[in-house]
């Protein structure tokens, strides 16, 4: 499901730059996803937990390549590290689609802890209300379910009109055992 969603986003916005944070879909993408052009896929999901990287990196990508749509893929946990930076995208009117995968916590970290038999502690922070956050930023918020076509439609809805937040609220990227 993770790669199917990444493929749907790529196909919905060809030539885009997809920037990622340390999230399960990005880790899966690093293994199984092919972007449509060199330099169009980059992230900090290299095993060192660089949470908070995605939002400012997407802003940099949008400034560096204004002719390309930018999609930022970040989890709800990672978004909390740099969420105020979305206001920079607002101030600069950057056409970035911030895709926030809201699985109610640090699922990548929790899964890793479970895999090695460590008690899962500190992996369930309460996420902000991203619809209210988008409203306070003065940008659109779109909710999407776990259907790749619905997610593709959501990311194109406000394309080219400044930043927006697309929140995936269903556990689309949850491990199979969840």
Kindly label every feature range from the protein language model.
Residues 13-16, 37-40, 65-70, 92-97, ...:
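Short coil/turn connectors at secondary-structure junctions
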């Amino acid at each position: 499901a993770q790669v199917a969603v990444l493929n749907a986003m790529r196909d919905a916005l060809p030539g885009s730059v997809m920037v990622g944070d340390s999230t399960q879909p990005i880790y899966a993408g690093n293994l199984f996803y092919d972007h449509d052009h060199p330099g169009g896929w980059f992230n900090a999901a290299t095993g060192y937990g660089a949470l908070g990287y995605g939002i400012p990196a997407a802003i940099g990508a949008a400034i560096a390549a204004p002719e390309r749509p930018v999609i930022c893929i970040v989890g709800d946990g990672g978004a909390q590290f740099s969420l105020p930076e979305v206001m920079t995208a607002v101030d600069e009117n950057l056409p970035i689609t911030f895709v926030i995968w809201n699985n109610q916590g640090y699922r990548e970290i929790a899964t890793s802890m479970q895999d090695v038999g460590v008690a899962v502690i500190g992996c369930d922070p309460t996420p902000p209300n991203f619809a209210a956050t988008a409203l306070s930023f003065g940008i659109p918020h779109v909710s999407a379910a776990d259907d790749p076509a619905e997610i593709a439609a959501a990311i194109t809805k406000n394309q080219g009109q400044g930043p927006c937040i697309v929140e995936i609220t269903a556990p689309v990227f949850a491990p199979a055992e969840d």
